[in-house]
Each structure stands twice: as structure tokens, then as C-alpha cells.
């Protein structure tokens, strides 16, 4: 069985969630089947689409140009990212005509995926609720954890943290459904309470520059000014293989969101960076990340929009060594559960079965 994994996102040195997921899916599938990855590159070029026509199995998110190319092909749609819910938050209650067209196009792609897919992938069980009309079987393939050694040899290249206040790391973007302002307010309050720390936004310019909006950049600039001198941001998106080094030099990973439908159905890809780096997590109630953090003791869960609760959580993790060490131990314990070779097993098993049927 020849497999092609497709993503409309960037795959390269600097990647966001969809590109990271596609590259790891291709890597794991490549251990069992001839596998090709078709993606956008950092210079804006795209891989040759010929592999889409030649494949026996296509795997990818619903996207422009991704469809069954010939009779006999099987197609697996990856629905890990609740795009419709994200767009509704991004465009607000009064979307422009162009935004409405975009939203309708994405809804059409989802409907096509549900009607023609041979197999559907979601990231966790609750996402099944989004697709009650699905005709194909649904399997759960969460996001995964990369090798613990990805960036270990680069630690010496980063500025030393000796003598610096503990870093609270915001590892993702500043999308409309997230809540960076509460993180900023909390870090200001912690410092004003006499506990030194700083908040670092790991990177600001997403690799797929077509998705950048000036207003989002402006909001981040305002937050940086408001939080100075306790809040900083790296000027560029950090290379994927360097992220673990930055996390390991941080004391806490923070990921906060607003109380929206997106929050309930999103898996939070940056959660898995924190698991790989074994850095305790502060996250907002509701959603996969909050449930995992609370159930497995990986950090602290806080109410939405409550900067006081976030500040208390930061102080608790910074001052309570026993709690901090328990979180680190629990992160190390669950890491192997989310290794890419483990989380992709349901997909690999289906493809092995399809291969037997073809033989």
C-alpha cells in the first residue's frame, strides 16, 4: 500500500501544529508502508502533487485540492483541528462577506469529508460529537510527543538562565480563542507580590504567513508594553527542534483560553511540548488539556479569565517544591503513552488491514 500524507501547512525548520502532525504521521507510517509527505515549504513552494495521484491511500485534513484523485483510492480525513469553531471565534459575530465565503467553504469541505471519507480521525473522544452524520468509521489519534532528545544538544546555544527569574512559557500563538491577557495580568500580579518571574511568548510569526493578521500582532504588542518589564516575546517563530530546549529552561508552561466551544473540542498541541519537556502546566478549565492535567497531576487548572487564580497557581508551583516535583514525575510517567509510534497505532492497524484486503 502506497501512502501519501498531505498538509496545506508549512513543513520545515519552523512548523505549527498541522505541519508537525503531518510530518510525524508520515514518519511513523513510513516505518510500515511506502509513504510520501506533500506539504508547503518555508520558501513558499509546494511539493509535487504527483504523489496524490499515485497513492493507494491519501491522508490529510479537509483542504483545498485534497480529494480522492482516482477510483480505487482510499482517503482518510484528519479532523483533529476543529477549524469551523476556530473560524467562528476568529471572525466574530459580524463576519465580512469574504469571511463568510471562507467559512462556508470550510463547512463544505467538512461535509465532503464526512460523506466520502473511508476513515475519519479525531484527536480524542469528545470530538466525535462534532460529526454525528459521519458515515465512515472514526478512530482516535491524539497529538503526539516527539523524541525527548530532539534539542538536548542545543541547550548550550541558548542564553543561560542562571541568575534570571523563573520563566513562564507561552508556547503557542495568540489566536482569538486564547487568553494571553490573563497570563500577562497574572505575571504582573506575581511580581508585584514579591515573587520574581517573567512571561515569555515563545514566538510570534506563524510559519504559514498567509494566516498572519496585523490586528493580532498589534494586540501582542499592546500586551508586551502593558506587561513590561515582566513580559517578553521572541521576535520569530522558534524552530521546531529547538522548542524543547526553551521549555526545559522554563519553570512552567502556560496555556490559557476563553470559555468557548473551541475550548471544549480542541486538543492544544502545545500541551505535548510540555509533556515532552516535563514542564508543569497551568491551563484553563475545560477541554482535553485541562482534563489530562487534572486527572494525571501535571500542573494546575484554573477558571477562565481569572488572573488571580493564575497568579496563585504560578506562586504555588514556584514555591511548593514537592508539588512541582510530583508534576514533573507525572509528566515523565505519561510521556510514553503519547509517543508518536503509540498514538498512530490505530491508524497503522487500519492500513495493515486494508493492505491484507488488497492482497
Annotate the PLM regions.
Residues 4-6, 121, 159-178, 184-187, ...:
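Conserved donor-binding/catalytic core segment of Leloir-type glycosyltransferases
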Residues 49, 83, 99-120:
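Membrane-proximal helix-turn-helix segments that form the acceptor-binding/catalytic region
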Residues 71-93, 100, 121, 139-142:
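Active-site proximal beta-strand in glycosyltransferases
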Residues 110-138, 147-149:
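A short, active-site helix/loop in glycosyltransferases that binds the activated sugar's phosphate group
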Residues 118, 245-264, 279:
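Acidic donor-binding loop of glycosyltransferase active sites
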Residues 165, 203-206, 212-247:
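Nucleotide-activated donor-binding/catalytic signature segment of Leloir-type glycosyltransferases, i.e.
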Residues 295-296, 300-307, 316-321:
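Conserved acidic donor-binding segment of nucleotide-sugar-dependent glycosyltransferases
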Residues 305, 322-353:
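A charged, aromatic-enriched C-terminal amphipathic alpha-helix characteristic of glycosyltransferases
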Amino acid at each position: 500500500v502506497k501512502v501519501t500524507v498531505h498538509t496545506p501547512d508549512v513543513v520545515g525548520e519552523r512548523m505549527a501544529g498541522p505541519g508537525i502532525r503531518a510530518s510525524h504521521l508520515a514518519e511513523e507510517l513510513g516505518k510500515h508502508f511506502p509513504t510520501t509527505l506533500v506539504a508547503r515549504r518555508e520558501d513558499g513552494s509546494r511539493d509535487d502533487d504527483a504523489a496524490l495521484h499515485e497513492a493507494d491511500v491519501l491522508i490529510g485534513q479537509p483542504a483545498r485540492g485534497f480529494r480522492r484523485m482516482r477510483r480505487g483510492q482510499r482517503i482518510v480525513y484528519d479532523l483533529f483541528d476543529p477549524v469551523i469553531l476556530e473560524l467562528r471565534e476568529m471572525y466574530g459575530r459580524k463576519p465580512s462577506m469574504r469571511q463568510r465565503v471562507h467559512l462556508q467553504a470550510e463547512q463544505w469541505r467538512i461535509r465532503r469529508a464526512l460523506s466520502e471519507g473511508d476513515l475519519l480521525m479525531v484527536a480524542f473522544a469528545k470530538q466525535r460529537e462534532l460529526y454525528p452524520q459521519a458515515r465512515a468509521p472514526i478512530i482516535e489519534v491524539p497529538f503526539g510527543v516527539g523524541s525527548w532528545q530532539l534539542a538536548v544538544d542545543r541547550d548550550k546555544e541558548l542564553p543561560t538562565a542562571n541568575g534570571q527569574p523563573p520563566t513562564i512559557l507561552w508556547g503557542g500563538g495568540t489566536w482569538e480563542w486564547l487568553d494571553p491577557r490573563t497570563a500577562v495580568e497574572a505575571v504582573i500580579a506575581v511580581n508585584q507580590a514579591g515573587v520574581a518571574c517573567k512571561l515569555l511568548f515563545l514566538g510570534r510569526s506563524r510559519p504559514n504567513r498567509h494566516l498572519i493578521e496585523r490586528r493580532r500582532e498589534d494586540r501582542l504588542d499592546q500586551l508586551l508594553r502593558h506587561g513590561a518589564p515582566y513580559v517578553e516575546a521572541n521576535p520569530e517563530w522558534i524552530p521546531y527542534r529547538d522548542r524543547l530546549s526553551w521549555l526545559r529552561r522554563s519553570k512552567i508552561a502556560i496555556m490559557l483560553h476563553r470559555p468557548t466551544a473551541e475550548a471544549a473540542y480542541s486538543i492544544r498541541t502545545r500541551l505535548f511540548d510540555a509533556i515532552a519537556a516535563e514542564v508543569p502546566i497551568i491551563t484553563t478549565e475545560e477541554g482535553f488539556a485541562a482534563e489530562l492535567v487534572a486527572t494525571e497531576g501535571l500542573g494546575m487548572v484554573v477558571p477562565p479569565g481569572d488572573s488571580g487564580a493564575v497568579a496563585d497557581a504560578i506562586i504555588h508551583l514556584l514555591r511548593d517544591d514537592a508539588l512541582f516535583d510530583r508534576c514533573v514525575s507525572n509528566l515523565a510517567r505519561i510521556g510514553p503513552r503519547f509517543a508518536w509510534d503509540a498514538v498512530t497505532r490505530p491508524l497503522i492497524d487500519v492500513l495493515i488491514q486494508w493492505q491484507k484486503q488488497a492482497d
